[in-house]
Structure formats: C-alpha cells, structure tokens
Amino acid sequence: MSQTTTNPHVAVLAFPFSTHAAPLLAVVRRLAAAAPHAVFSFFSTSQSNASIFHDSMHTMQCNIKSYDISDGVPEGYVFAGRPQEDIELFTRAAPESFRQGMVMAVAETGRPVSCLVADAFIWFAADMAAEMGLAWLPFWTAGPNSLSTHVYIDEIREKIGVSGIQGREDELLNFIPGMSKVRFRDLQEGIVFGNLNSLFSRMLHRMGQVLPKATAVFINSFEELDDSLTNDLKSKLKTYLNIGPFNLITPPPVVPNTTGCLQWLKERKPTSVVYISFGTVTTPPPAEVVALSEALEASRVPFIWSLRDKARVHLPEGFLEKTRGYGMVVPWAPQAEVLAHEAVGAFVTHCGWNSLWESVAGGVPLICRPFFGDQRLNGRMVEDVLEIGVRIEGGVFTKSGLMSCFDQILSQEKGKKLRENLRALRETADRAVGPKGSSTENFITLVDLVSKPKDV
C-alpha cells in the first residue's frame, strides 16, 4: 500500500562509480533545504561517501545522513582486471546491501522510509519501491539524448540489430524523435554494439525498460534545450522533470588553488588560452597525448593542461621545457573557475555532461574528443545541434587536426559564431533556472513528490 506521512524519510540509493554520486548528493542537498521536515538517508559505499561528503560536512544540512553499504568485494578478493569488474561485484550485492542500510536508517531515525530516490542505474529500486508501496524517483545524471537511447533501447535494437554496425556507422537515428542528427556510431556501448551480455549492459537494458514505470524521472538539464526530446520523453515517462543545469543554480564551491592557474590566466589576453582536461576517469592513449603535445608546441597557443602525474611519462621529451613560457601542465585545475575566466578561449574535453555545462557557463567553445558512454552523443549535440563547439576529425587526436581546431576557434570567424551561440544558450538556461523558469517549477514538483508522498 502507498504511504503518506507528516515525517518523510527519503532513502537515497547512489551508484558509487564515476561522477554519479556527487550530483545526486547535490540534488539531495537542495531537497533537504526545501523540505527541512524530511529526513534524507544517503546510501553509498564508504569510499564514495568519503569522497563526496568530506569537503562539505561543515555545511551539510542536519537532515541528511550518510550510510556506508558494502562494495560487494569479498574479503581477500583479487581483481582479475576485467572491464567493469568492480561494478559487477557491487551490483550483485547491492539489493541486499541497500535493504540492510535502510533497516539501520529506520532504526536510527524512528521513521519508516516514505520514498525511494535513486540513481537511474539502480534499476532494481523499481522492484524495491513496488514491494514497499512507495514512490520511486530515479535520477538521470547525464543528458536527455542518452536517456532517450535507453528508453528506446528495444526499438533501436529491433531496427538496427545487435550483430554490429560495420558499414552502417554513419546511418542516422532518425526514427527516434529528437535524434535525427545522431549516427549509429554515436550510440553508447551496450545499446547495439559492445558486449551486450555483460552484467553492466544487461543492467542498463533493464533500466531502460523499467524507467517508464517510475513515479517521476528527474534530470540535470532544462526543457528548452531541445523541445523535441523534451516533448517525446514527457510522452514516454509518467513525469519527466528537468531541474538543471545544476552549476547555474548552485555554483561549485571555491577550492584552494595551489597550482597558480588563475593567477597565470590574469596575464593572458581574452579568449587566447586553450584549457585541456578529460575528467577524473579518462586519459587519452599515449599516442594521442603525443599528438596533443605536438599540436600545442607547433601552434604556440597558451594552454593549461590538467594531466594526472602518472600520465606525464607519455609527454614527448623536452615538451615541458619548450612550452614553459606559454603553457602550464598541472595535476589538477579548478575547472569551473578556469572556464569562467575571460582569458580562456577553447576547452579540449572528453565531453562529459558536467564538463559541457561548465563550458557553457563560461561561454567557452568546446573541442570534443569523446571516449565512451554518452560522450559521443554529447559531442554530436555540441557540434551539429547546439553549434557550440567542434568534434575532432576522425575521432582521435592528430597534430594537424588539433591545430585546425585551435585556428578555427581562436582565430577565425567560426569561433565568434560559437561564442554567440554559447551566450544565447546560457541566457536560455539562466531563464530556466530563474524564479519563474521551467527548471524551478519542476524542482517545486520534485520537492512535493519527495516530501508529500502520494499514491504511486
């Protein structure tokens, strides 16, 4: 039976890999502030919780508490090095781990769980919510384009087949509303190519099938980004709530900058600097690190390159010395602040969803080199739909290809046009998160669903 309570207790089930848990916690913090009478129990692994709660504990609302659950790795287990091995171990143990965590939270708070909020990857939360008679509110951390491919996964497989796309890579996904410029090659692994039988692929397949059953799906985007996608997803899902972009609502906290990046930028001309970063997960293959280095050296564009220390071994001999006068290679950079600086004129990126919106916030055109997952879809959207950046020709870094991108964005009329499009997009996004904007109204709806549970 469904449950209504004046003392809401929201169980939040996180996916503790990549950058999934942090944006979910960001939403929970907003919800906790908007519904101070509710209690939010946040469940993730100890490693994940330590990384996302540590820096914000002094400002964390008192109605949020984290609970550590098992990572599913048996004691003494030796990893075999299989792709997504850690995800598989976690996923197998997760249903029972989350249940045990909720029992503990109920005992501590004295409140029964009244609502399940979960990362969409935790698809079995649908079954748990049904068993408990609760609303299930999955959070999609990426964009509406990738969400659509999962919701339509069975139709896509029926149309394209699952025996590979060789020779059909550039055919268009024009049978899915809002996806007419997407090519087969842009799809994520696990949709029609890759190991479709892996536990991770099967998990995402099942997720796409059950999302239409959710009480509401909420997402870090805004309705006006793509009317076609928005309207179609509204027709496929019970309730579809765009509540972002998050970085325009709650700017990331200012963190101490020990690398000197921001001071260095003060000495550079407007829109002259190339910023390079591929997120917290990805490093380009060694040959592409070399190609990027050669392009920077030959073009002599000022640059800041956020490169992990362990990847420095792939830099060409003498590169750091030769570029010292106009470039910085640092192990980490305050990305949002760097992209917001007027000196930055281009962003070489993997095209992750969060990085994309930090670039939009700063008005910086993107040079996209996608690697996996939704990144290819995002790159296509950046170049062909939104027209706020370019993709690397051929999909891999080459010296000549990069130099051409630098020239287009920093020196040619195209760069000016991209920046104009970015300004217009930023203005539209700002309206969405404004007092009467669509994202603001949708967030009010989400608060109502979370704090005043109704029939599921």
From Swiss-Prot:
UniProt xrefs under InterPro entries: UDP_glucos_trans (IPR002213), UDP_glycos_trans_CS (IPR035595)
Q: Name one Pfam family in it.
A: UDPGT
**What residues make up the catalytic site?**
H20 (proton acceptor), D119 (charge relay)
Enzyme Commission number(s) of this protein = 2.4.1.115, 2.4.1.91
> What does the tissue specificity note say?
Detected only in berry skin.
**What are the GO MF terms of this UniProt record?**
anthocyanidin 3-O-glucosyltransferase activity; flavonol 3-O-glucosyltransferase activity
Which leading EC class covers this enzyme?
A: transferase
Q: What is this protein called?
A: Anthocyanidin 3-O-glucosyltransferase UFGT
Task: Please give the organism.
Answer: Vitis vinifera
